[in-house]
Amino acid sequence: MARADKATAVANIAEQFKAATAALITEYRGLTVANLAELRRSLTGSASYAVAKNTLIKRAASEVGIEGLDELFAGPTAIAFVTGEPVDAAKAIKTFAKEHKALVIKGGYMDGHPMTVAEVERIADLESREVLLAKLAGAMKGTFAKAIGLFNAPTSQMARLTAALQEKKAFEPASAE
């Protein structure tokens, strides 16, 4: 690879690091081109999957200020640059790794911090953003309904008490004075 080509490749990788919300690092040794194409299809919309030389990735990462990942760049390395929800991309990679034992998750980088394999898998086990928001909305709806019931309770209790007193007075004989 010519020096100019390397500089272009480093610039492209650095740009992908800058644009990504997270980067998931994998080893793809033993996967076929068809397997890699299948993995890329499963990541559609949430991430792009790129294979690059380790030295170029290290250089690009240091250019954008990403530290602590050098030990992950050994062997055939590919990176999923996540532009959407990290949960979706992590789920897709974890699912693919279960089906294809040749794909090994090495770690990742998110919010300025390196991630271990366990952290990437924990993110993959989370529910999607939409599901979590729906659960939050449901919990809030229940809480609001309880609060409204509590606020309305004194008023409704007073109304029932007044109605009971009126009924009681209606059935009592008028007192003679």
From Swiss-Prot:
GO molecular function terms attached to this record: large ribosomal subunit rRNA binding; structural constituent of ribosome
Statement: the UniProt record of this protein carries the keyword Ribosomal protein: yes
CDD domains documented for this protein: Ribosomal_L10
Pfam families xrefs: Ribosomal_L10
GO biological processes: translation
Subunit-structure text: Part of the ribosomal stalk of the 50S ribosomal subunit. The N-terminus interacts with L11 and the large rRNA to form the base of the stalk. The C-terminus forms an elongated spine to which L12 dimers bind in a sequential fashion forming a multimeric L10(L12)X complex.
Function per UniProt: Forms part of the ribosomal stalk, playing a central role in the interaction of the ribosome with GTP-bound translation factors.
Sequence similarity: Belongs to the universal ribosomal protein uL10 family.
Record protein name field: Large ribosomal subunit protein uL10
Lineage start: Bacteria, Bacillati, Actinomycetota, Actinomycetes, Mycobacteriales
Gene transcribed to yield this protein: rplJ
